[in-house]
Amino acid sequence: MNWSRLASAVVGLLISASCALGQASLSDMASRIDLSDADRAEITKQVDRYTAMIATGTPANVRDGREALTKPFEADKVTVPFRVEAGRQLVEALKPLTTSSNELVAVNTLRIAGEVATTNSMALLIDGLKDPRPPVRMGAAYALTRLFAQARRSAPAISAGDTASALKALETFIAAERDARLIDTAISAMVLAAKAPGGIAAPDRMARAIVEKARGKGAEADTLTITSRAVREMRDVLIGSDGKAPPGTARAAAEVAGQLIVAIKSQLTTADKEALITAAGSAETTLTIASTTLAGPDIAAMKLALADKVRAADQDGLSKQAERVLAVLKSEPFNIK
């Protein structure tokens, strides 16, 4: 055995290890309030390394690059200074990749931008919602759910104005989108936005966006599916508020519940019966809670029994109850047109 060569190898390993120990990882930096020039240089180095891996388009490289760049944002306490600095560098490097002809690259790049959760990274996601490719639009919508989840779990690096811009973009997205799965993801993003800066009315805006979608002529999306999802979310918002939801939220919940009843009535003989029964129950429960919140009519006393009407395939009975509900929604305290 060549002991000289072995000794040299050991020394080399020790030197490499000592360098690595002296060099902070991105995850180590994530909790720092003050970033040094060396920290910024290391961020640059790792951003360049992993974005280059993603750019190759090789599935394994894309996965490894994405995981390396999102891992720092999984820390319990990601500071705003780190998020802003890492975000600044990442957005610059990621921007050309978000429009890559390789959908795998574009989607994973948007996912990273969502975890970064800054003003600049949000702009990439809003642009992604307009991409002509459905998988990329889905990636952008999902990344917005991650962005708002990040804003909830640590000090947010987005403003109320940023949230407003995202909500407007999601409303536009819902109005134009034909795929119910993508709309469902947009609903998730808008619900999560409620806890972001300036996002308190996000669920209301989501509900009204779905109502407008359902009322639209020639809407290709599955109206029953998306309206049912919106009603469940608004029901949960009302329940979570313990009777103290803002009046606007209660009205929006009632409006989308009324729209769901219209959808159920129109699809009574064509849609899956179990799905209709579940939707009818959600609509009636949501109306009841909304009216109670607004000190409105006693919905329970109306004995709507919507689910029973659906179960019995009672078209006439369901139509009559739907008319009663719509009449209530047009009067005080709802005043829905």
Which residues fall in each region the model found?
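Boundary at the C-terminal end of the N-terminal hydrophobic targeting segment
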Residues: 20-24
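Bacterial N-terminal signal peptides that target proteins for export
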Residues: 1-10
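N-terminal low-complexity, Pro/Thr/Ser-rich intrinsically disordered segments
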Residues: 27-29
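Long internal repeat-built scaffold domains in very large eukaryotic proteins
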Residues: 196-337
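Amphipathic alpha-helical scaffolding segments comprising HEAT/armadillo-like alpha-solenoid repeats
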Residues: 32-52, 78-98, 118-129, 150-174, ...
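Short coil turns that connect the paired helices of HEAT/ARM alpha-solenoid repeats
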Residues: 56-60, 96-104, 129-135, 173-181, ...
